[in-house]
From Swiss-Prot:
PTM summary: Palmitoleoylation is required for efficient binding to frizzled receptors. Depalmitoleoylation leads to Wnt signaling pathway inhibition.
Name of this protein: Protein Wnt-2b-B
GO biological process, any: cell fate commitment
Single GO MF descriptor: cytokine activity
Keywords from the named record: Developmental protein, Disulfide bond, Extracellular matrix, Glycoprotein, Lipoprotein, Secreted, Wnt signaling pathway
Amino acid sequence: QECKCHVSGSCTLRTCWRALSDFRRTGDYLRRRMNGAVQVMATQDGANFTSARQGYRRATRTDLVYFDNSPDYCVLDKAAGSLGTAGRVCSKTSKGTDGCEIMCCGRGYDTTRVTRVTQCECKFHWCC
């Protein structure tokens, strides 16, 4: 909920409205929930589901659940529509998904130094 004071500035009268939470906060919350998701499989009658792994906790009503593991996007998988990451350009300094540590999936990577010479369209102006 967000509120704003009226013109007087004394906040004796405010207008409030419902608003979406910050996008980063929502994403962080979903990431935490996803990391705790429980893999399940359908029961024999198909009316319910149970934990897919013996000895793991049962899913609660508020847990995120999933049936199938995610595909391995590191390798070519035409059925999943993944071209893999081999041969792609990565950023050695980035810690994000474009960084070599993540994109190369532990396979290692080669570095190449590229030097580009370009015309800068610079002009010299005598000033003093």
